[in-house]
C-alpha cells in the first residue's frame, strides 16, 4: 500500500475530480499509462453498476494499460465516483494483480483546517491559507506472483506522488486553456 497527500492551491475539488474521472485522457498525461479508455456500457458488470447508483455514485468501467520499466499490464477497472469527494477504481480483471484499488479523496483545505483546529492565515501568495484542496491518493494492491511483488513494490514507491503531480499539472493546464 502506498499513499501520498498534497495540498493543491487555487483549484476546486470539482475540477480535480473531473480530471480524475476523465479516463479517456490518461494516456496523454498520466505517468506509466500507455492506454486508457472507458468501455462501452453494455460490457459493464450490471450488479456493480446497480450497487454504485444505489449509493448515489457514478459508475463506469475502463480498460487501462500500465507499463513500468520491465513489465506492462492490461486490466479493467470498475470506477465509482462520489462527486466531488472521492473516486475509487478497483481492478476487476488483471493477470499481475490479485487486487488493486486506487482511491482519490478531495477535501477543501478550509474544512481540513477547521477539523484540525487551525486558524486561517495568508499563505504568502495572496491566497488565504484555506484556499485549496487536500488531495489524498492511495494505491492498495496485492500481486499474484511473488517474483513480481518485489519489482512492483519498488516501482510503486514513486507512483503515488508522481500521479498527484501529473493530475495537478493537468488541472492547471486545463484551467489556463479555459482562461484564454
Question: Where is each model-derived feature located?
Answer:
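Hydrophobic-ligand binding "helix-grip"
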Residues: 31, 35, 40-42, 65-132, ...
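Hydrophobic ligand-binding cavity/cleft-lining segments
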Residues: 1-57
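Eukaryotic N-terminal low-complexity, Ser/Thr- and Lys/Arg-rich leader segments
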Residues: 1, 118, 177-180
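Exposed loop/turn and edge beta-strand positions of beta-sandwich/beta-sheet ligand-binding modules
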Residues: 2, 100, 137
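Hydrophobic pocket/interface hotspot
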Residues: 16-20, 26, 62, 137, ...
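Short, well-structured hydrophobic secondary-structure segments
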Residues: 57-65
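Short structural boundary motif marking the start of a folded domain
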Residues: 1-2, 131-133
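A conserved amphipathic terminal alpha-helix motif
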Residues: 141-180
Amino acid at each position: 500500500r502506498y499513499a501520498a497527500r498534497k495540498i493543491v492551491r487555487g483549484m476546486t475539488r470539482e475540477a480535480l475530480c473531473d480530471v480524475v474521472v476523465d479516463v479517456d485522457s490518461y494516456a496523454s498525461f498520466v505517468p506509466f499509462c500507455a492506454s486508457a479508455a472507458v468501455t462501452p456500457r453494455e460490457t459493464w458488470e450490471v450488479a456493480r453498476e446497480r450497487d454504485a447508483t444505489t449509493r448515489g455514485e457514478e459508475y463506469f468501467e475502463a480498460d487501462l494499460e500500465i507499463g513500468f520499466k520491465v513489465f506492462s499490464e492490461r486490466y479493467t477497472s470498475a470506477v465509482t465516483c462520489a462527486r466531488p469527494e472521492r473516486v475509487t477504481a478497483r481492478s476487476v480483471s488483471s493477470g499481475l494483480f490479485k487486487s488493486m484499488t486506487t482511491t482519490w479523496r478531495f477535501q477543501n483545505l478550509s474544512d481540513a483546517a477547521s477539523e484540525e483546529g487551525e486558524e486561517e492565515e495568508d499563505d504568502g501568495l495572496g491566497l488565504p491559507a484555506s484556499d485549496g484542496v487536500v488531495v489524498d491518493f492511495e494505491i492498495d494492491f496485492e500481486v499474484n506472483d511473488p517474483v513480481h511483488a518485489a519489482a512492483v513494490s519498488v516501482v510503486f514507491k514513486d507512483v503515488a506522488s508522481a500521479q498527484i503531480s501529473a493530475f495537478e499539472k493537468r488541472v492547471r493546464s486545463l484551467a489556463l486553456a479555459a482562461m484564454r
